[in-house]
Amino acid sequence: MAEEQARHVKNGLECIRALKAEPIGSLAIEEAMAAWSEISDNPGQERATCREEKAGSSGLSKPCLSAIGSTEGGAPRIRGQGPGESDDDAETLGIPPRNLQASSTGLQCYYVYDHSGEAVKGIQDADSIMVQSGLDGDSTLSGGDNESENSDVDIGEPDTEGYAITDRGSAPISMGFRASDVETAEGGEIHELLRLQSRGNNFPKLGKTLNVPPPPDPGRASTSGTPIKKGTERRLASFGTEIASLLTGGATQCARKSPSEPSGPGAPAGNVPEYVSNAALIQEWTPESGTTISPRSQNNEEGGDYYDDELFSDVQDIKTALAKIHEDNQKIISKLESLLLLKGEVESIKKQINRQNISISTLEGHLSSIMIAIPGLGKDPNDPTADVEINPDLKPIIGRDSGRALAEVLKKPVASRQLQGMTNGRTSSRGQLLKEFQPKPIGKKMSSAVGFVPDTGPASRSVIRSIIKSSRLEEDRKRYLMTLLDDIKGANDLAKFHQMLMKIIMK
């Protein structure tokens, strides 16, 4: 099969080169077109011509070129033509004899016949013919030569398995596929096909036959259909189109009343619903409703995934909404998880605050028991409160162990030292601090908490500037006093300036 295909391709290329080298004359083309129109207008004459070819007659009223067979030399020849008739038939077409081999392939055509011999119209491309299974009632494609010279197996030769082998091209095809794929069947498939043909014996004649479906009705095809296959030689769209489905979703259309009387007993039709042209969705059938299930609903029950367009869109909308809800739920769950983490952190913060409160309470308790040291010396003798006795309850040392602290810092009175041997001896004299723990007296010529005494140091000038800035004097006077302070030199002048400044502020 592959060798035949390669030979056909080679012959076609040679014909194309010959046509380019020596084009066919316009007169020959017109005569060929006239012959083709006569064949199309007179199918009976075409059938008679092909029957004469099958019977082996040497004369042809109209040439019928083969689309399948080829000569041993590689060039296509005219069907039913003898060895010496090529020149006469070439002269009938108006083609020069020397260019017949090169130009005859340009006039090739395909003929498809059924079993009755009727020509099938509308076939433009043999590759687009879909082959169906079956032995009876199918049309056949007749295109073989009488001599079976291209057959690989002789007619009637017994097979190794015991089956009568006929021509390879006469085997019926058991599965539907294109005519161009017929030649790819090899090996066991060929033997199986030949075995089925030998058992059938339903073909009236031998030869290369193919089971093909009847040509489709162009009137029933959808006008908006797009071609599903392009031509191979002329690059024209074939007859195959996508036919729109005639099934419509909805309720069953009403049936017209039959004029004939029913032969059998009638059935009540009181619960028949009113007629509707179409319905978007058919509910499940119930005996009370009287509605019928459409074929599409039955297909759904059988397992086919067929949905009405509107129902399918509704389902898609529901799926989209569910996906959106699921996404929102995931976001809410993530936020709740973050809230749970924050709740744990808040609990830990509360625990830390409680521990800090406990620590603060402990410090408050400690501060309540701390002894405050108030020195009894260092006061100004002119102060009227200098002779006031210090509260004996105020301890002069910071500490919690008052007994140990007092024993370390207080010196015992003389009376207590004299009465050490007396167990019940008590004295009214108070204890006094040791000299190393007694504060030194405050000097009158040094700055202290009692009063400010200016000196030549920068700290004294800074204190005076602060006094000027914090006073309620006018800004002009403040600036004037600042300039005077910068011009003063010496400790005595600075002390006088300080006394003058205090008098101005106190006014």
UniProtKB/Swiss-Prot annotation:
Residues 146-160 have a biased composition (Acidic residues). Residues 304-376 are annotated as: Multimerization. GO terms for biological process: DNA-templated transcription; viral genome replication. It comes from the Viruses. The modification Phosphoserine is found at S86, S151. Residues 457-507 are annotated as: X domain (XD). One of its GO terms (molecular function) is RNA-directed RNA polymerase activity. InterPro entries: P/V_Pprotein_paramyxoviral, Paramyxo_P/V_N, RNA_pol_Pprot-P_XD_paramyxovir. Residues 361-377, 396-410 are annotated as: Interaction with the L polymerase. Residues 134-145, 260-270 have a biased composition (Low complexity). Phosphorylation on serines by host CK2 is necessary for the formation of viral factories. Signal peptide: none annotated. Residues 41-99, 134-163, 201-231, 250-273 are annotated as: Disordered. Keywords: Phosphoprotein, Viral RNA replication. Residues 1-48 are annotated as: Interaction with N0. Residues 459-507 are annotated as: Interaction with the nucleocapsid (N-RNA). Homotetramer. Interacts (via multimerization domain and XD domain) with polymerase L; this interaction forms the polymerase L-P complex. Interacts (via N-terminus) with N0 (via Ncore); this interaction allows P to chaperon N0 to avoid N polymerization and non-specific RNA binding before encapsidation. Interacts (via C-terminus) with N-RNA template (via Ntail); this interaction maintains the P/L complex anchored to the nucleocapsid template during the sequential transcription. Interacts (via C-terminus) with protein C this interaction allows C to associate with the ribonucleocapsid. Belongs to the morbillivirus P protein family. Essential cofactor of the RNA polymerase L that plays a central role in the transcription and replication by forming the polymerase complex with RNA polymerase L and recruiting L to the genomic N-RNA template for RNA synthesis. Also plays a central role in the encapsidation of nascent RNA chains by forming the encapsidation complex with the nucleocapsid protein N (N-P complex). Acts as a chaperone for newly synthesized free N protein, so-called N0, allowing encapsidation of nascent RNA chains during replication. The N-terminus consists of a long intrinsically disordered tail. The central part contains the coiled-coil multimerization domain (MD). Forms a four-stranded coiled coil structure. The C-terminus constitutes the alpha-helical domain (XD) that binds to the nucleocapsid (N-RNA complex). This is Phosphoprotein. The lineage of its organism: Viruses, Riboviria, Orthornavirae, Negarnaviricota, Haploviricotina. The gene is P/V.
